[in-house]
Amino acid sequence: MKTAHGRIQPVFYWAVGALLVVILAAVLLPTQLEQITATVQQFISSTFGWYYLIAVTLFALVCLFIIISPYGKIKLGKDDDKPEYGYLTWFAMLFSAGMGIGLVFFGAAEPMSHFAINSPTVEEGTIEAARESMRFVFFHYGIHAWGIYAIIAVCLAYFNFRKGKPGLISGTLSPLMNTDGLKGKFIDGFGLVATVTGIVTSLGFGAVQMNGGISFLFDLPINFWIQTIIIVIVTVLFLTSAMTGLNKGIRILSNFNMILALILLMFIATFGSTMFSLNLFTNTLGTYLQTLPELSFRIAPGSPDAREWINDWTIFYWAWWIAWSPYVGTFIARVSRGRTLREFTIAVLIVPSIVGFIWFSFVGGTAMSLELNEVINLSALTNEEMMFGMLSTMPISTITSIVTIVLIAVFFITSADSATFVLGMHSTNGSNNPPNGIKFVWGMVLSVTAIALLYSGGLQAVQNVMIIAAFPFSIILLMMVFSLIKSLRSERSQFSTNQPQLVIRKQSREDEDDSSTTDKD
């Protein structure tokens, strides 16, 4: 099958076939599939939790090594390539694709959960619980999470723009194996299915969460039909954006989102628990950095309750970020041509982590402060309602709540828009500008599937499948890291070989200048 700009690859049909099997099972046998996948997920967490901790920490360490090493000077592209986007637009795009919607949804809910309901180490509802809660939020949304995104993105961008390989996962493994045949197609198909399951579950759960927020504000019911209307509206908007391309749709919406998020953050910082949040940010940043090695390898042997918490939160999050990484990494790589490895890794690893820390400190800090001072019982609300409950204690709460819903919706749109772009790339042999036709097809597949799963109650089962798929994909990620290191070492040796020649040429020019000066004298 051909489109206006390229050929749809067989991996598209294989991925759709595999996806249909999963979706049909989730629609027809949601309870059975959820039970089976939950058991498998629990087995992986209990048996291979140690592996996840080591692997994800390794990804973060490799990113830090790239920042401080001489390899950081290497361009993602030809040596004279210039960045396609300015810093602010580039950062807005990668942040919107990576974690933007999660910060809005869980900015208040996650710190409140650790603080009031399920504290990992101390008594719930205390100031100590507030400090511990924020420390673990920093850990789960900090450099480990962004390290996963950064490592896959840097591999994809390096091999695509500098080595001329297709913008596919298989293209990053060429130094280790021949990926032109079935092996490469299988790897790309696996990444495609992981991307689709991740986006579908996010569309479904996102619709439920938006329904919860609208219900809190306008006293509307929470039901399938309202969620379907939300998905239909979002689909029309993200497909319209997708048809306009990166330089219009996603770029404009991402910039708009960052401005709106900054306005909302400044409002909360002004009318929320300002000093408590500032002190909490400062204190947590110190304890996070101080205890980062311990947190990175904390597995709690011989302590069943602590180990259960680690499985349910830390291991789950590492698997979740890994499962999302094919989509987020591909998109970040696509918009990063012309950057050096160093500036790319700093921008993807450090900057979003700090922004997330600030957001959680003010939003989550204000929520916990309100609960500590008995202003409002936020822990009695659902996750979908906590952000709006917190805003209800501040001036112009109706307006700020509507702004929050708009912010969630636009993050929703940019995520789905980016996803259709990435799926289009993977379906057309890594094309950096996939045709609108294939993006439209994927957009419809995502939306119809999300609606079907909402109707059947199979969303949780598909999310479990996504988390399970993270385990084998983490092995592919490790292979990508070794492949990148091997290729960088080869390139570094070429630089070392060329260096004496540069010195000789420079010395020759100096000798010529000296000779010329002598002649004139």
Predicted features along the sequence, with ranges:
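N-terminal alpha-helical transmembrane segments of multi-pass membrane transport
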Residues: 1-129, 243, 266, 482-492, ...
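Membrane-water interface regions at transmembrane-helix termini and the short interhelical loops
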Residues: 1-5, 29-44, 63-82, 133-140, ...
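Flexible loop linkers connecting adjacent transmembrane helices
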Residues: 2, 35-41, 69-87, 112-135, ...
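Transmembrane-helix boundary/entry motifs in multi-pass membrane transporters
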Residues: 2-10, 45-49, 79-97, 133-143, ...
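Helix-loop-helix module between adjacent transmembrane segments
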Residues: 4-6, 10-13, 18-27, 60-65, ...
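Hydrophobic alpha-helical segments of multi-pass membrane transport proteins
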Residues: 18, 51-68, 261-272, 355-365, ...
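Membrane-embedded translocation segments of transport machinery
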Residues: 182-186, 190-339, 346, 351-402, ...
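Long, low-complexity, intrinsically disordered cytosolic termini of multi-pass membrane proteins
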Residues: 499-521
